[in-house]
Amino acid sequence: SSLTIQFVEGQFVDSYDPTIENTFTK
């Protein structure tokens, strides 16, 4: 589960919006 989220989050969010990445990652 964690691996899937990290993968999708790293790929999708990175191409989606940096702001979302910061909110989820941080």
Curated annotation (Swiss-Prot):
Known EC number: 3.6.5.-
Keywords attached to this entry: GTP-binding, Hydrolase, Magnesium, Metal-binding, Nucleotide-binding
Enzyme class: hydrolase
Positions of short motif Effector region: 16-24
Chain sites annotated for binding GTP: S1, S2, V13, Y16, T19
Residues bound to Mg(2+): S1, T19
Catalytic reaction annotation: GTP + H2O = GDP + phosphate + H(+)
Keyword Membrane carried by entry: no
GO molecular function, one term: metal ion binding
Keyword Magnesium among record annotations: yes
Cross-referenced InterPro entries: P-loop_NTPase
Family of this protein: Belongs to the small GTPase superfamily. Rheb family.
Function, in words: Binds GTP and exhibits intrinsic GTPase activity.
Protein name per its UniProtKB record: GTP-binding protein Rheb
Organism for this UniProt entry: Crocodylus siamensis
Gene: RHEB
